[in-house]
Amino acid sequence: AKKYGIKKLIIAGDFFTLDIASKYQQVVPAIQWEMERKAGRLVVAELLEWFDDLRFLMGNHDRRLQRLTDGQLDENDIFGMISSSDKVHVSNWGHCVVENKNKDGYPWRITHSSNYSINQLTVADALSNKFQMNIISHHEHHLAQGWDRYKRFVVINNGCLVDQNKLAYVMLDDNKMSGMTLGFVMLQNGVATTFGKYPYTDWNEITDDKE
């Protein structure tokens, strides 16, 4: 972000884990809310040292607290517990639209959809044709970028920022689920660039470390 002068950050859902409010029974002790809240405050404080505009969308994990309280806690209640900064903006929506300043380009829909596919870009492709715009999709923990099936819209799976080796439901028992991978997207001048772990991204080039 500092290299490219990016001052606005959108966290598109699942900032929290909230396993304590999951409908699934836990097989290992869940992280307590006090610990999540404290960690959240530290992360947001550090992000605000650089970013001037921090925007949160809701993901399925964040909504666990809403469901636990039968909707009595809204997005301001939840995220208000980690920051009161006027640089922080929260939404109860699981998506937002970023207009494309290039008159020849389509807008970008950033979404934490409720759908999952084992095949990367499948959900993003369907959403692009439903909403007629470029898609940056979350929730599935894939990292990929391409065109929709008709080659009109750019479709992206944004990856995730979580260590899957620390997720009990992923690691304890064998399963045929897709793997997860780290990643994020930079949107600048109407163009999206995806970043992932090496060799998806040459981080020596990004950080100007030539050694």
In which residue ranges do the predicted regions lie?
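Short, solvent-exposed secondary-structure boundary motifs
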Residues: 80-91, 168-178
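Core catalytic region of metal-dependent phosphoesterases/phosphodiesterases
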Residues: 1-90
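Short acidic low-complexity segments
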Residues: 87-104
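A short, hydrophobic/aromatic-rich structural module that often spans a beta strand
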Residues: 60-66, 112, 205-211
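Short, basic, glycine/proline-bearing loop/turn elements
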Residues: 28-29, 102-112
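Conserved beta-sheet core of the metallophosphoesterase superfamily
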Residues: 107-196, 202, 208
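Flexible, charged surface loops at secondary-structure boundaries
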Residues: 1-5, 48-50, 83-84, 102-105, ...
